[in-house]
UniProtKB/Swiss-Prot annotation:
This is Oryzalexin D synthase. Heme binds at C442. It comes from Oryza sativa subsp. japonica (Rice). Belongs to the cytochrome P450 family. Disulfide bonds: none annotated.
C-alpha cells in the first residue's frame, strides 16, 4: 500500500513539473509574449503571493508592479488578470466572443450542474443561447416583472415591518436584508415564504443553500491542479453533490405540487414558476433546466442584493451628510406619503447615485465570474492571452482606476449625478461594471435594478439610522473581506429609529 501511494505521489509531482516547465517555455516562445507577472515557483506558482488578506486587493497590488494585464499562476492554472479600464475596454470590445466561456470551479461540477447551468455553459453553446433568450423574453421581461411587482412590494413591506418591530434596537443589517430578500425571491419565483413558513422543507432549503454558498468560496486543490480533479482530494465536490441532490429534491417537490395545481385547474399564482412551467410544457426547456434556474436565483440573486444593501448602508452611516441629503430628496419627492412604492425609486436620482457609488467602491462581485479563453488569438495590451487560461476582470480595481475617476477611493455620489451621459448598470461604460459587461452580463439585472433602490428608499423613508453604542461615523469599519463575494470584514450593526 505504501509503495503504491509513493508511486502515486511521484507521478503527481512529475506531471506537475512537466506542466511547470511547459509553461515557462511557452512564456518565452515566439509570437506575442504572455503578459508580465511574478515569477512562479515550482508546483505552487504564485499561490504564496495571494494567500491571506483580501484577494482583489492583492491582485491590484500585484498589478501596480507588473501592469494592468498580468499573468498569474495559481498552482498549475494560468490566469490573466485585467485591472484597468483601458485593458477591459479592449478585451470586451475586441474579444468578448472569444472570452465568453466560463472557468468552472470544480465544486460546481457536482451533479453535472455546470453542464446545464446558464452561468457556466459557454456562450457559443446553443443551450446557452436558448436559456439566455428564455430569461430575456419570459422571466425578466417588463410584463412578467410588472405582474410580480405586487409580491415584491408586499415582501418589502414585510421587511419594513420586521424593522419596525425592532425599532430602537441593534440589528444586523446584512442578516435582515438577506432574510427579507430571500423571502421576496422565493415568493416571486414560486410563492413560498422560505423564512417565515413553518414547514421543515422551507427551513431545510434555506440551510442547504446557505451551506453551498459557504463551501464554493473555499480554495480547492482541484482548481489549482486540474489533473488531480478526478481524485477530489478535499471531498468538496462529493460534499456539494449531497447538498445539490437535497436542494433539487426539495425544489422538485415544489414543482410537482405546482404541476398538480395546474392539472386541477386551480387559479394561477402569476409568479416566475408559472411562466417557466409554461415553457416546459411547450418543450422549450426540461425539468433540469427549471431546477437549475430556481437554484441560480437563490444562490446569486438573494445573496448579491442583500450584500449590496449592506454596503450602501455602511457607506451612508460612514457619511452622515450623504444620508441626510438622500433623506431630504425622499421628503421632497414623496412628501407625506407613508409607504414607498417600487416605481418611486425612479424619481430619486440622488438615491440612485448613492447606490451606484457604493457599488463602484464595493462591488459584491469584485472579480466578476471568471472568464475562460476558448481559443488562441486574443491579445490585450499587446500581450497574448493563451488558450485555456482563466481571465479575471478585477472589477474592483477597474472601478477605482484613477484614469477614469477623480478621487477614486472616496465616496462621492455626486459624480453620478453630474456625469453626462448618465452611467447605467449595463456595463457599456466599462469603468462602471458591477454586473459585468458584454455577453455575460448578469441576467438578473432587470430584477436587481428594481428591487435594491426600492428597498433602500423604503429603509431611509421609514427610519433614521444610527450606529450602536455611541459609535461615531469615524469609528465605523468599512474594510473589505473576500469570500465568495466582497463582504464587510465586520458585519454592519445599526439601530433603526422610527420617523414619527
Amino acid at each position: 500500500m505504501e509503495n503504491s501511494q509513493m508511486w502515486l505521489l511521484w507521478g503527481a509531482l512529475s506531471v506537475a513539473l512537466f506542466f511547470y516547465f511547459s509553461t515557462l517555455r511557452r512564456r518565452y516562445a515566439g509570437g506575442k509574449p504572455l503578459p508580465p507577472g511574478p515569477t512562479p515557483l515550482p508546483l505552487i506558482g504564485n499561490l504564496h503571493l495571494v494567500g491571506g488578506g483580501t484577494f482583489h486587493h492583492k491582485l491590484r497590488d500585484l498589478a501596480r508592479v507588473h501592469g494592468p494585464v498580468m499573468t498569474l499562476k495559481l498552482g498549475l492554472a494560468t490566469n490573466v488578470v485585467i485591472s484597468s479600464r483601458e485593458a477591459a475596454i479592449e478585451a470586451y470590445t475586441k474579444y468578448d466572443r472569444h472570452l465568453a466561456a466560463r472557468a468552472t470551479p470544480d465544486t460546481f461540477r457536482a451533479c453535472g450542474f455546470a453542464d446545464r447551468s446558464m452561468v457556466f455553459i459557454p456562450s457559443s453553446d446553443p443551450q446557452w443561447k436558448a436559456l439566455r433568450g428564455i430569461h430575456a423574453s419570459h422571466v425578466f421581461t417588463p410584463r412578467v416583472l410588472a405582474a410580480v411587482r405586487p409580491i415584491r412590494e408586499r415582501k418589502v413591506g414585510d421587511l419594513i415591518a420586521y424593522l419596525r418591530a425592532h425599532a430602537g434596537e441593534e440589528v444586523l443589517v446584512g442578516h435582515a436584508m438577506y432574510t427579507g430578500i430571500l423571502n421576496m425571491v422565493s415568493f416571486s419565483y414560486f410563492s413560498v415564504d422560505i423564512v417565515d413558513m413553518g414547514s421543515q422543507m422551507a427551513r431545510e432549503l434555506r440551510e442547504v443553500v446557505d451551506d453551498i454558498i459557504l463551501v464554493v468560496g473555499k480554495p480547492n486543490v482541484s482548481d489549482f491542479y486540474p489533473f488531480l480533479r478526478p481524485l477530489d482530494l478535499q471531498g468538496l465536490r462529493r460534499w456539494t453533490t449531497k447538498r445539490f441532490n437535497r436542494v433539487f429534491s426539495i425544489m422538485g417537490d415544489i414543482i410537482d405540487r405546482r404541476l398538480a395545481h395546474i392539472r386541477d385547474n386551480k387559479p394561477r399564482h402569476d409568479d416566475f414558476l408559472d411562466s417557466i412551467l409554461e415553457l416546459m410544457a411547450a418543450g422549450k426547456i426540461d425539468r433540469v433546466n427549471v431546477l437549475n434556474m430556481l437554484f441560480e436565483a437563490f444562490v446569486a440573486g438573494a445573496d448579491t442584493m442583500a450584500l449590496t444593501l449592506e454596503w450602501v448602508m455602511a457607506e451612508l452611516l460612514k457619511n452622515p451628510s450623504v444620508m441626510a441629503k438622500a433623506r431630504a430628496e425622499l421628503r421632497d419627492v414623496l412628501g407625506d406619503k407613508e409607504i414607498v412604492e417600487e416605481a418611486d425609486a425612479a424619481r430619486l436620482p440622488y438615491l440612485q447615485a448613492v447606490l451606484k457609488e457604493a457599488m463602484r467602491l464595493h462591488p459584491v462581485g469584485a472579480l466578476l465570474l471568471p472568464h475562460f479563453a476558448m481559443e488562441d488569438g486574443v491579445e490585450v495590451g499587446g500581450y497574448a492571452v493563451p488558450k485555456g487560461s482563466t481571465v479575471l476582470f478585477n472589477a474592483w480595481a477597474i472601478m477605482r482606476d484613477a484614469a477614469a475617476w477623480e478621487r477614486p477611493d472616496e465616496f462621492v455620489p455626486e459624480r453620478f449625478v453630474e456625469r453626462t451621459p448618465q452611467l447605467d448598470f449595463r456595463g457599456k461604460d466599462v469603468e462602471f461594471m458591477p454586473f459585468g459587461s458584454g455577453r455575460r452580463l448578469c441576467p438578473g439585472l432587470p430584477l436587481a435594478e428594481r428591487v435594491v433602490p426600492f428597498i433602500l428608499a423604503s429603509m431611509l423613508h421609514t427610519f433614521e439610522w444610527e450606529l450602536p453604542g455611541g459609535m461615531t461615523a469615524e469609528e465605523l469599519d468599512v474594510s473589505e473581506k473576500f469570500k465568495t463575494a466582497n463582504v464587510l470584514a465586520v458585519p454592519l450593526k445599526a439601530v433603526p429609529v422610527l420617523i414619527k
